[in-house]
UniProtKB/Swiss-Prot annotation:
Pfam families: ATP-grasp, PurT_C, RS_preATP-grasp-like
A molecular function (GO) term: magnesium ion binding
Enzymatic class: ligase
One GO-annotated biological process of the protein: 'de novo' IMP biosynthetic process
Name of this chain's protein: Formate-dependent phosphoribosylglycinamide formyltransferase
GO cellular component: cytosol
Ligand binding (N(1)-(5-phospho-beta-D-ribosyl)glycinamide): E15, L16, E75, D280, K350, R357, R358
Length: 389
């Protein structure tokens, strides 16, 4: 039996955390939003806010112990995961588990789990702890290769390298954009995939698993640009993706929504990455599903029923990005952006801008995917950012 209201403490307060906070408050929860900077998006709608360095173990422990939440919901990768394990040992519920957060915060740990222990199909890969090691490991994978920090946010620090001459620059980019204490990179073969998908996987308290219809998406510089749902998969591809997602989420345990990413290469389904939380490509569910990914996350976390997940025939999202630095942002063009039926625009409330920063998202439904994607693209293009220093 779930007793409400619960007290929810969010570690990370960006646009995804903001939607988690809204979903929690609609269930009567008291929300404490934490992040490393003030006035983060989720803080704007939360009951309370805390600013702290979340990689600081003592600071994180102090905040959580002072608030005594029902659940702690991590929403970012850069956390003092040893503190989460300590809190879990004290009887606090960490979503989905402290181990899941620790394993998935670094690409090497989740890749070793998936490719090694669980024997899931992945791209060929190697690790390098220096530029010299990168030069030694990359050629065996064939050119081009993809170089990534083992820990980063929103695809930052990723490079596609066509030959040995680009490896030093790729190493520097990875180190400059690495989060936490990351000191090495993962280098992967470049997959010529047909489609990249996210399978939102909901693990409930009783261990049962539900799936949302697959979400197709496109990235640039490792960061999501647009997504659409449902993505077209064969029955065989969908069955394989669901089986792999169930295998890895069962291993990680706990309750909540996971964003499990795959590459589709011909008939093959290849595991890519996993986030133990709502996924940026899943923003499309704000318009596509009867229960969006944030509502599904909260229902699973709190042990509430999920009777059915229904999806529109065609829906799409397109991000709205900043193109320069500034500390004051205003928007125009919303009249044009919202003039078509079944469209919506979410502005995230970020006060500062920088090139490539995600400031909002346009959403649309259509009779078919081409129409939905075109509507989302037009809506996003109509929004103009005015950025001042």
């Amino acid at each position: 039996m779930t007793t409400l209201p619960a007290k929810v403490l969010l570690l990370g307060s960006g646009e995804l955390g903001k939607e988690v906070a809204i979903a929690a408050q609609r269930l009567g929860c008291h929300v404490i939003a934490c992040d490393r900077y003030a006035d983060a998006p989720a803080m704007q709608v939360a009951d309370e806010a805390e600013v702290l360095a979340m990689t600081d173990r003592e600071a994180l422990l102090e905040v959580v112990r002072r608030h005594k939440p029902t659940v702690v919901i991590p929403e970012i990768e850069a956390l003092a995961v040893n503190a989460l394990a300590e809190l879990e040992d004290e009887g606090l519920t960490v979503i989905p588990t402290a181990r899941a957060t620790a394993v998935t915060m670094n690409r090497d740990r989740i890749r070793d789990l998936a490719a090694g222990e669980l024997a899931l199909r992945t791209a060929r890969f190697a690790y390098a702890a220096s530029a010299e090691e990168l030069h030694a490991e990359a050629p065996a994978l064939g050119w081009p290769v993809v170089v990534k920090p083992v820990m980063s946010s929103s695809g930052k620090g990723q490079s596609v390298v066509d030959g040995p001459e680009g490896l030093n620059e790729a190493w520097e980019a990875a180190m400059a954009n690495a989060r936490g204490t990351s000191t090495h990179v993962i280098v992967e073969e470049f997959l010529r995939f047909d489609l990249e998908i996210t399978l939102l996987t909901i693990r409930q308290r009783d261990g049962s698993t539900l799936f949302c219809p697959p979400i197709g998406h496109e990235q640039a510089r490792g960061d999501y640009q647009c997504s659409w749902q449902p993505a077209a998969l064969s029955d065989k591809q969908l069955s394989e993706a669901q089986a792999m997602a169930r295998t890895v989420t069962d291993n990680l345990g706990g309750a909540g929504l996971f964003g499990v990413e795959f590459f589709l290469c011909g008939d093959e389904v290849i595991f890519s990455e996993l986030s133990p939380r709502p996924h940026d490509t899943g923003l499309v569910t704000l318009i596509s599903q009867n229960l969006n990914e944030f509502e599904l996350h909260l229902r699973a976390v709190l042990g509430l029923p999920i009777p059915a997940i229904r999806c529109a025939d065609a829906a799409a999202s397109r991000v709205i990005l900043a193109d320069k630095h500034g500390s004051r942002v205003t928007y125009s063009g919303m009249e044009e952006a919202l003039q078509e039926s079944e469209t919506s625009v979410f502005l995230f409330g970020k006060r500062d801008a920088r090139p490539g920063r995600r400031m909002g998202v346009a959403l649309a439904r259509g009779e078919h995917q081409a129409e939905a994607r075109a509507k989302a693209d037009r809506s996003a293009a109509a929004v103009h950012l005015h950025i001042e220093d």
